[in-house]
Design a protein with these regions (language model features):
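Coiled-coil dimerization/phosphotransfer module
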Residues: 1-125
């Protein structure tokens, strides 16, 4: 929540968080990498999306952490993601892959972007 609050204060982009899963419920071995990926996604939104709203949803479905970050920005052509230079996307994919997880990006020009992170995870009570 501090990350979203700080992001909103710094950028003026309205943020909302949904779901009842708390960061402290995620094992540290997983939460650190996922947190870094969320930071990178927010940085990309700030620098490229021209968004006014960001919604973050965190859920635990079975033994899986499901985190979705969605903005209402300008969107992008996802076919260009593998062509673009830059280490941000590669680092995000590598971090999630290292957790045996999956990073999915869905976007269309003019319709915002959604990043979904799915990671196997036994939650802490």
């Amino acid at each position: 929540d501090d990350l979203l609050h700080d992001f909103s204060q710094r950028t003026g982009i309205v943020t909302s968080r949904h779901g009842n899963l708390q960061w402290r419920s995620i094992p540290k071995t997983i939460s650190t990498d996922v947190y870094r990926v969320v930071q990178e996604v927010l940085l990309n939104i700030e620098q490229h999306a021209d968004a006014t709203q960001v919604q973050v949803t965190m859920a635990n479905t079975g033994n899986q952490l499901c985190l979705t970050i969605q903005d209402n920005g300008q969107g992008m052509d996802t076919t260009q993601l593998t062509v673009k230079k830059g280490i941000g996307l590669k680092n995000m994919r590598d971090r999630i892959k290292g957790l045996q997880g999956q990073l999915l990006i869905d976007s269309q020009l003019g319709q915002g972007t959604q990043v979904q992170i799915n990671v196997p995870c036994e939650m802490i009570d």
